[in-house]
């Protein structure tokens, strides 16, 4: 998150804590909802559930508004709430073992790779999404927070309640598993592109 965005969030946080400013609360919601949605939906595999959890995150923020000035990093604070809600949801799901296949197909993670760095076929994108989706829970959460939500290692360590070294190790494991899983051969892809012209 940019310094300007961080300063703005801190300003909104103060307005909410001191004055119960509903306009600041709405702006905070608009600012943090998109990254929270990507994070939660990547874990719970359900867009409607993710939307509901975002509401729950902000209800908790509003309920704790008097104490918000004590929160050092509201962005991290919201992601910790989101993580806990997501894990609680998954635990309930595991107990009931009821899965909705449509939710899985709707929420394949949308891994972004800069097109200037790499031409990628639709099939390769699908393979990458499946590889990310098949990562173990903690690896996937760390990968999502760092690669899709642009959190720093230290912030992820705070969110996950683990050491920075563990974050580094888990990200390395995630990247290795993704790489192995997709069995990517750049030279072969480039040859196919040159021969077919696609």
Language-model regions, residue ranges each:
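Arg/Lys-rich amphipathic alpha helix in sigma70-family domain 2
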Residues: 80-99
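Short, charged helix-capping/linker segments at alpha-helix termini
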Residues: 17-27, 37-56
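Helix-turn-helix DNA-binding module
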Residues: 130-133, 137, 141, 149-166
């Amino acid at each position: 998150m940019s310094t300007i965005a961080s300063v703005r969030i801190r300003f909104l946080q103060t307005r909410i804590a001191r004055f119960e400013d509903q306009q600041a609360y709405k702006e905070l919601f608009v600012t943090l909802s998109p990254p929270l949605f990507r994070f939660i939906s990547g874990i719970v595999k359900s867009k409607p559930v993710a939307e509901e959890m975002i509401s729950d995150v902000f209800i908790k923020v509003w309920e704790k508004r008097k104490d918000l000035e004590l929160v050092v990093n509201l962005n991290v604070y919201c992601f910790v709430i989101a993580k806990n809600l997501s894990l609680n949801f998954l635990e309930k799901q595991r107990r009931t073992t009821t899965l909705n296949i449509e939710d899985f197909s709707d929420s394949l993670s949308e891994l972004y790779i800069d097109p200037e760095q790499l031409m990628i076929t639709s099939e390769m994108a699908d393979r990458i999404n499946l590889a990310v989706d098949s990562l173990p829970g903690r690896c996937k959460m760390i990968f999502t927070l760092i690669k899709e939500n642009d959190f720093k290692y230290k912030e992820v360590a705070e969110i996950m309640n683990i050491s920075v070294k563990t974050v580094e190790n888990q990200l390395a494991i995630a990247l290795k598993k993704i790489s192995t899983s997709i069995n990517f051969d750049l030279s072969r892809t480039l040859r196919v592109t040159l021969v077919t012209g696609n």
